[in-house]
């Protein structure tokens, strides 16, 4: 069993966003060995009966984060587009009636009931008119196959996967998403994922990803390990670190991981789940509210606000909760334009990729398409290497020689 020092919990700031009931809980960052390592969270029976046809209208996180107050003040995510990379979302779920959800997938997978339930739960946290963090946001859903999927359906064409992490991230960026929420483990992804994340950073798109539920350091198996990605761990409603939550150098913040009211995917009976998946969707939703409130702030400044408002003492970083549990109130109260226009999570503890130089080169169009085949299709080479033209017929990327903005900066 591993323990970290407990510390006093800062007082919450209205209208919402605090850790622990009334902000009085101590932060005991405690990790224990746990069997609760299910991909969608650990399941326990819910005590309250409900009918499957009725919408689930109560969630503990809704009162915990004072989201009713946020809605009353107009913080609903209106005008913001969130991308959800997960299984297929059941848009017929009563909790999602009235939500704006658009399936932007390029293909259709054959998923299990478990995978559909997980994706539907994530969509519920994000945009449900009843309990969603950002009920007026537009949600783009992208179908990703995972361990629970039955088959890849129409998603594999001529050996190319149309639903890989890098393909879906690039598609979400091209579709205009401002925030991407991913509550899935990844394993090894290769260089294509690195350039997809560089693409998101270059376009000012925030990726939020779960830390995992293995009660272990899982920095190598989740997207949070990458530069610029908001890795999310889980806390309990008393403010302590959740025993099931993984941790690692990629963690940036934390949020409540449960209990979350849902339906069992097999029996359709009420149950509760918990996990970093829920924490991730909560963080993505709160970032959408910050985007709505501060439309003129840059992505870097929004991220600066996230780490500077984290509830760790002095916002100091640790591998369990990053810079501290998210303070939703701080994100909408504090004007992020006061902060530097610099990405505070571009380089993570122990090193991460893409490097700052790789992101800068990608942004300026200076990564040669002859050096890697894994660049996004939308990438345009703007460097001065005229030898690239010799290979133009074999390349998928456009070439605009000598047009990099770096050449014109003073």
Map each language-model feature to its residues.
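Hydrolase catalytic cores
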Residues: 144, 257-326
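C-terminal subdomain of the subtilisin-like protease fold in secreted/lumenal serine endopeptidases
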Residues: 294-409
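Structural recognition of the beta-strand scaffold that forms the well-ordered cores
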Residues: 81-85, 138-143, 173, 178-183, ...
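Substrate-binding/access-modulating region of protease and related hydrolase catalytic domains
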Residues: 148-224, 271-274, 278
């Amino acid at each position: 069993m591993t323990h970290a020092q407990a510390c006093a919990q800062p007082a919450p700031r209205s209208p919402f966003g605090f850790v622990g009931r009334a902000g009085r809980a101590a932060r005991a960052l405690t990790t224990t060995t746990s069997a609760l390592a299910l991909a969608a969270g650990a399941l326990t029976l819910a005590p309250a009966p409900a009918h499957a046809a009725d919408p689930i209208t109560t969630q503990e996180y809704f009162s915990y984060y004072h989201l009713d107050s946020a809605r009353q003040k107009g913080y609903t995510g209106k005008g913001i587009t969130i991308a959800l990379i997960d299984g297929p979302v059941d848009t017929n779920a009563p909790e999602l009636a009235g939500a704006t959800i658009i399936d932007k997938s390029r293909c259709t997978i054959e998923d299990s009931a478990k995978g559909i339930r997980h994706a539907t739960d994530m969509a519920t946290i994000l945009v449900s008119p009843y309990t969603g963090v950002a009920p007026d946001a537009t949600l783009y859903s992208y179908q990703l196959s995972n361990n629970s999927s039955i088959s890849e359906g129409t998603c594999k064409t001529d050996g190319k996967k149309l639903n890989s992490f890098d393909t879906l991230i690039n598609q979400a960026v091209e579709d205009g998403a401002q925030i991407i929420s991913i509550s899935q483990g990844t394993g090894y992804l290769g260089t294509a994922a690195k350039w997809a994340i560089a693409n998101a950073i270059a376009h000012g798109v925030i990726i939020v990803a779960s830390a995992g539920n293995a009660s272990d350091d899982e920095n190598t198996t989740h997207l949070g390990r990458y530069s610029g990605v908001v890795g999310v761990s889980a806390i309990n409603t008393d403010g302590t670190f959740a025993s099931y939550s993984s941790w690692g150098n990629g963690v940036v913040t934390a949020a409540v991981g449960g209990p979350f009211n849902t339906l069992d995917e097999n029996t359709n009976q009420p149950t509760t789940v918990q996990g970093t998946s829920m924490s991730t969707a909560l963080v993505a939703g709160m970032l959408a509210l910050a985007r709505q409130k501060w439309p003129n702030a840059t992505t870097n400044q929004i991220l600066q606000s996230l780490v500077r408002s984290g509830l760790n003492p002095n916002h100091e970083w640790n591998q369990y909760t990053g810079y501290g549990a998210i303070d939703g109130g701080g994100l909408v109260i504090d004007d992020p334009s006061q902060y530097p226009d610099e990405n505070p999570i571009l380089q993570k503890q122990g090193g991460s990729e893409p490097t700052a130089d790789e992101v800068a080169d990608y942004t300026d169009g200076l990564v040669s398409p002859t050096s890697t085949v894994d660049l996004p299709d939308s990438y345009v080479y703007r460097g001065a290497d005229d030898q690239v033209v010799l290979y133009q017929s074999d390349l998928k990327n456009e070439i605009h020689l000598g047009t990099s903005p770096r050449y014109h900066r003073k």
